[in-house]
Amino acid sequence: GGAFAVFYLTVAIAFHYYHIFSQTMAFIILIGVTVFMSVLSVVYNRRELAIISLVGGFLAPFIVSSGEGSYLVLFTYVSILNLGMFGLSIYKKWGELPMISFVFTWLIMGIFLLFSYTSSSTVISGHLFLFTTLFYFIFLLPVFSILRGEDMRTKSRGLVFVIITNNFIYLLSGALF
C-alpha cells in the first residue's frame, strides 16, 4: 500500500514540478494505478489495499488538478468510481468501502458547492441535481444489498446512518438546486 502512495506522489511531482506528463496523461496513470490496486486487493484478498485504492481514487483528480477542471468530468469520474466500489464491496463483502465512498463523495460535492458553485446558472444547477440524484441512488444500492444479507444486526447502525444521511443530503440538494 505504501508503495502505491509513493507512486501517486511521484506522478503528482512529475506533473506539477517537472511537467513530464500532461494533465490528462497523469490522470490516466493515476486511474490505472487505482484499477491495478483494486485488482490486487481482490487477488490477494486485502481489504486495506482496497481502502487505499479507493482513497487514492478519490484523491487522483485533485492530485493532477490545475484549478481549471470541469465539474462534469469530476462528478462523472466520482460516479464511475462509486459504481466500481459498489461492485467490489458486493463481490468481496467489504462493507466499509461504501461508507468511505459515501463520505468522500459528499465531501467533494460539499466543497464544490462552498467554493465553486454559483446559483446563477440553471444549467449547472440541473447538472448538479442530476449528479446528486445519481449519488443518492448509488448509495441506496449497498442498503438494498445489506437488506438482502443474512446478518443485518451487525450492520444496522451503518445502515441507519447511510439511510438518514443520504436522505437528508438529497433533500438538502433538492432545496438548494
PLM segments and residue spans:
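Alpha-helical multi-pass membrane segments and their bilayer interfacial helix-loop junctions
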Residues: 1-177
